Regions:
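Lipid interaction determinants
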Residues: 10, 16-162
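Bacterial N-terminal signal peptides that target proteins for export
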Residues: 1-6
Length: 162
């Protein structure tokens, strides 16, 4: 049985996606913000820092790739990280890829490969998205965070780079 997961994405989009938005979705998008909203406490935070890194790529053929990195990640002391350094680096990133479908206001990502093997074979659901000029904003439904188990929703925004 496949688990249904919700991808990291944005809160508070007032207007639903249109058919025009889905046509504008393919491209290369650079992450510009990541905001975490804890459902139980109402607390907002920037768990990836003020300037997160990463890219989201959607192709016209239905494929996607997503990477996200915390700002100010620890730099290993040598070219080959120690196991402790590897663990610290691993805790400050996400990455996954696969195929996607636009279903009305939602984007359904079917995961083929991921930094966390437990995500492979799952679907990430992006509840709402909006493409405005060169900006992509995405909204998630509440989901359990893999870093600490808290029930959260996440806001991500991107700038089109290609």
């Amino acid at each position: 049985m496949h688990r249904l997961l919700v991808t990291s994405v944005a809160l508070g989009i007032a207007t639903p996606a249109s058919a025009d938005d889905s046509a504008k979705l393919p491209g290369v998008w650079k992450m510009t913000s990541w905001t975490r909203h804890e459902i139980a406490t109402g607390k907002d935070g920037k768990s990836f820092g003020e300037h997160p890194g990463g890219y989201l790529i959607y192709t016209k053929g239905g494929y996607f790739m997503w990477t996200g990195f915390k700002d100010q990640r620890p730099r290993p002391a040598a070219a080959e990280p120690t196991d402790t350094e590897r663990a610290a680096l691993f805790k400050t990133m996400y990455a996954y890829n696969g195929t996607y479908k636009v279903e009305g206001d939602k984007i359904v990502d079917s995961v083929d490969g991921a930094w966390n093997e437990g995500w492979v074979g799952t679907k990430f659901i992006i509840d709402k998205y909006e493409v405005s000029d060169k900006t992509l904003t995405m909204v998630s439904a509440p989901f359990k965070a893999s870093m600490d188990g808290a029930e959260i929703a996440v806001t991500t925004t991107y700038e089109r780079v290609e």
